[in-house]
A protein has these predicted regions:
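Glycine-rich anion/phosphate-binding loops
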Residues: 85-86, 119-134
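Glycine-rich phosphate- or other oxyanion-binding loops that anchor nucleotides, phosphorylated ligands
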Residues: 108-110, 121-128, 162-166
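A generic structural signal for short coil/turn motifs at secondary-structure boundaries
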Residues: 117-121, 154-155
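Conserved catalytic cores of soluble enzyme domains
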Residues: 147-233
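Intrinsically disordered, low-complexity segments enriched in small/flexible residues
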Residues: 1-107, 113-118
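A generic local secondary-structure boundary/capping motif
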Residues: 79-81, 91-92, 96-101, 131-135, ...
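A structural preference for short, pocket-lining loop segments at secondary-structure junctions
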Residues: 93-113, 128-156
Length: 233
């Protein structure tokens, strides 16, 4: 019996260490170069935006271990490092609970992470977004969303049956929240395509001076034969 406990404790310790390691990979401390790049532009990281938005230790994250649906062409360890959270942080938090009280402070927080595949919208990314908006509708909670990112992502090759992503419910879900859940969107940097749709269909829209917002990014415009443009044009 003692040997059994020792063996299983050893396995549990290993699994727990792996669990903690996975958690650490999604933090800024594990993305030093990406964090430096953000700060050089004068921007915050997604985690820093979340920290400034929510009350200390109030954020309950959903889907932190998600990675891009690209396992058939990229190593899983690489995906854990390079595509943490699949580019979007979602969860529950409170905002200004000391001022308004815990019940009135409950909020859904959604932050696009531009350091992960330019904040593009992938397969599991959309599933996370759909899940958290369903929770917002269920509990009638306000949403604060940071929408920086480049729209739909073409490289999620693990999904064999999806055509242009037009079968996803994300945008109809977002529209259905109107009149039920307050939606506050913040844009900074590049915000194109699906990201811009979420921004434009929010109740309150806040954009920094360094924002470039459009329903089509440079790649889509060029692909449509309309010419080559810089994203800031």
């Amino acid at each position: 019996y003692s040997a059994f406990l020792i063996e299983n404790n050893s396995k549990m310790n290993k699994e727990f260490k792996n669990f903690l390691s996975r958690l650490e990979k999604s933090k800024d401390s594990s993305k030093i170069e990406a964090t430096k790049k953000r700060h050089k532009l004068g921007y915050r990281t997604a985690r820093e935006n979340l920290e400034h938005l929510s009350d200390p230790d109030s954020f309950l994250e959903f889907g932190e271990f998600a990675v891009a649906a690209q396992r058939s062409r990229r190593d899983y360890e690489e995906l854990q490092k390079e595509t943490t959270t699949d580019g979007i942080i979602t969860g529950f938090c409170t905002i200004n609970a000391k001022e308004v009280g815990e019940n009135k402070a409950n909020t859904i927080g959604i932050v696009y992470d531009y350091s992960v595949l330019a904040g593009t919208q992938g397969f599991f990314h959309h599933q996370k977004l759909d899940r958290i908006t369903e929770q917002a509708e269920k509990f009638k909670l306000p949403i604060v969303i940071f929408t920086e990112g480049g729209g739909g992502r073409p490289g999620d090759v693990d999904v064999m049956t999806q055509i242009a992503g037009l079968n996803i419910p994300t945008f109809s879900n977002w529209a259905r929240l109107s009149g039920n859940c307050l939606k506050i969107a913040i844009a900074n940097g590049y915000c194109f395509a699906g990201n811009a749709a979420l921004f434009g269909c929010s109740d309150f829209r806040i954009a920094t001076k360094n924002s470039w917002i459009g329903m089509a990014g440079p790649a889509m415009i060029e692909g449509g034969g309309l010419g080559v443009f810089d994203p800031k044009e």
